[in-house]
């Protein structure tokens, strides 16, 4: 267990944070995904937050982070989402048309404290992209008639 310290404080504050683009749109591919990763990493370094594990999926972001006790989680997530939105729109101006001028991320987020199960959460985040791809493959079968094996479009056979 890694224990950090401030002047008169010993701390070990780890959090699993999940947030998504507005309308849960799948936009994090290729160059945009890399830019989001770079931006989030840079913003975390500015605040002294250590990223233990992170995964950017097409429609959401998982982060396992270590936040100093001098920063509240809600402040940090607000800072991360607010600043990253401005920087993403600066690099990818075309996204403003999909999301409006100031809203890239949806309003809410999920946060959970991490105790002794940090390794399990780290593994979960590492496997998240694989799990999403498997789920997408499963949903592809919903559009195939189970009796004939032929594609189905809006309840009708082609």
Predicted regions and their residues:
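Basic nucleic-acid-binding interfaces
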Residues: 1-158
């Amino acid at each position: 267990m890694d224990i950090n310290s401030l002047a008169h404080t010993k701390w070990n504050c780890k959090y699993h944070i999940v947030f998504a683009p507005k309308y849960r749109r799948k936009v994090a591919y290729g160059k945009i995904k890399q830019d989001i990763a770079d931006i989030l990493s840079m913003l975390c370094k500015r605040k002294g937050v250590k990223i233990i594990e992170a995964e950017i999926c097409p429609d959401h972001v998982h982060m396992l982070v270590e936040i100093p006790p001098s920063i509240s989680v809600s402040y940090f997530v607000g800072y991360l989402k607010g600043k990253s939105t401005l920087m993403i729109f600066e690099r990818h101006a075309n996204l403003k048309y999909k999301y409006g001028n100031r809203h890239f991320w949806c309003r809410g987020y999920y946060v959970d404290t991490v105790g002794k199960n940090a390794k399990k959460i780290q593994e979960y985040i590492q496997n998240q992209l694989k799990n999403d791809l498997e789920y997408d493959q499963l949903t592809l079968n919903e559009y195939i008639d189970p009796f004939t094996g032929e594609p189905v479009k809006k309840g009708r056979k082609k």
